[in-house]
């Protein structure tokens, strides 16, 4: 019994550790500072951080002599980035409660902090892994981002996607919930929340075979979503096609975790309906090109959906599906978003203020202002001159602590 507890339950302890207060001071001087996507940039500005919070920002900030200075020659500073769609499902994350800090720090840097991510949303993983990572990060034994997790995603009855069956260990498939009734879905969601989940992920449309999508019964999706909303949690959906998107809309989903990639029937009226309901979308454009096909006949209709959603002033969140997609570089996502008509300010909004607002923490993070949490990204170049500069990160600072530096 002791071994079973150690393996299955001990990693789930303390699922929401308190974020420790930051200590010390640092400054970034003579930088171009984008305090938010909508404010004018500060040229030759300084950001001063004390005890994990922004102390001051502006062109005339005095830096005391005892403050650590981050070297920054003509660099650019923004608020810390969010990746609103990640997964900790690669085998290298297994047994995260016990792996060495050095190994996990290297993996976190490679996948996340070297890309500027100070906050990430895990859209479905083994909670024993994700909760262990979060606990070790928040107790300062690891250098990593803040983690929101959906815990175990919910699938339609007999609706595990074919690509997960082909890639995940067989024993994990056993634990992937496929509720047959609305009542069962609610019980699973309540259990998820008790184990530390911060949001709900529904596969409202699941590719059970290549080219065939199985929609989730609307009653199951709706009751599960209602359960999450009663706890103040957001609901994500993997929609896949028209039917899956309609289930997402009708069941009260808040965020599409992908643009629907089977685009037939996903027209302007449907997109407008999503925007009217204040749904957000995470495009994950590179993922489609990397894991499905680079055929323009497949990709261009997806890009057209994103263009239309953006033109109708729908809220877009940045996310890459990294962890499922094992190419961690973010450059291609930025290029693809630019192809959809987004400029640097639009993309900065996706990376910062939009997710902070959607998750209800805009008063704490998402922009650079005195009193806010010192989550910062230092870039080598200006994304207003080159959109891929968002991918060239020099330093990542979370809660006033340098968690990545070149």
Residue ranges and their predicted role:
Residues 107-130, 144-152, 197-207, 234, ...:
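Divalent metal-dependent hydrolysis catalytic cores, especially in the metallo-beta-lactamase
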Residues 202-300, 322-324, 341-343, 357, ...:
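Active-site core of metal-dependent hydrolases
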Residues 13-14, 18, 24, 33, ...:
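Histidine-rich, glycine-flanked metal-binding segment
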Residues 92-95, 130, 245-253, 287-312, ...:
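Histidine/acidic-residue-rich catalytic or RNA/ligand-binding cores of hydrolases
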Residues 31, 351-353, 357, 370-406:
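C-terminal cap of metal-dependent C-N hydrolases
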Residues 95-143, 176-198:
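Alpha-helical scaffold segments that flank or form the walls of functional sites
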Residues 16, 298-382:
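His/Asp/Glu-enriched, well-ordered alpha-helical/loop segment
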């Amino acid at each position: 019994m002791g071994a079973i507890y150690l393996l299955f339950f001990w990693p789930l302890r303390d699922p929401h550790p308190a974020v420790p207060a930051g200590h010390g001071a640092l400054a970034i001087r003579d930088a171009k500072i984008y305090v938010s996507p909508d404010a004018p940039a500060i040229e030759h500005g300084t950001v001063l951080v004390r005890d994990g919070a922004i102390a001051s920002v502006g062109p005339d900030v005095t830096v005391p002599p005892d403050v650590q200075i981050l070297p920054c020659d003509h660099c650019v500073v923004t608020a810390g980035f969010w990746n609103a769609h990640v997964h900790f499902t690669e085998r290298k994350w297994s047994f995260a409660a016990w792996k060495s800090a050095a190994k996990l720090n290297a993996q976190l840097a490679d996948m996340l902090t070297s890309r500027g991510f100070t906050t990430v949303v895990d859209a479905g993983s083994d909670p024993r892994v994700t909760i262990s990572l979060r606990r070790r990060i928040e107790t300062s034994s690891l250098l990593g981002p803040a983690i929101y997790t959906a815990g175990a995603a919910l699938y339609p009855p007999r609706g595990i996607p074919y690509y997960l069956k082909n890639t995940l260990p067989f024993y994990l498939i056993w634990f992937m919930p496929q509720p047959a009734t609305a009542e069962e879905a609610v019980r699973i969601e309540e259990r998820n929340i008790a184990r530390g989940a911060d949001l709900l992920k529904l596969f409202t449309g699941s590719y059970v075979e290549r080219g065939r999508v199985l929609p989730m019964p609307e009653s199951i999706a709706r009751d599960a979503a209602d359960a999450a909303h009663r706890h103040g949690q957001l609901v994500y959906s993997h929609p896949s096609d028209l039917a899956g998107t309609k289930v997402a809309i009708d069941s009260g989903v808040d965020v599409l975790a992908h643009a629907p990639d089977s685009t037939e029937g996903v027209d302007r009226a449907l997109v407008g309906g999503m925007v009217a309901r204040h749904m957000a979308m995470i495009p994950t454009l590179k993922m489609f090109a990397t894991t499905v096909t680079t055929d323009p006949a497949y990709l261009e209709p997806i890009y057209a959906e994103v263009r239309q959603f953006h033109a109708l002033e729908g809220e877009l969140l940045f996310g890459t599906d990294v962890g499922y997609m094992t190419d961690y570089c973010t450059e291609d996502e930025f290029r693809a978003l630019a192809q959809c008509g987004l400029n640097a300010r639009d993309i900065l909004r996706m990376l910062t203020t939009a997710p902070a607002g959607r998750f209800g923490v805009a008063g704490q993070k998402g922009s650079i202002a005195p009193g806010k949490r010192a989550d910062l990204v230092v870039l080598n170049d200006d994304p207003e001159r080159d959109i891929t500069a968002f991918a060239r990160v020099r330093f990542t600072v979370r809660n006033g602590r340098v968690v990545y530096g070149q």
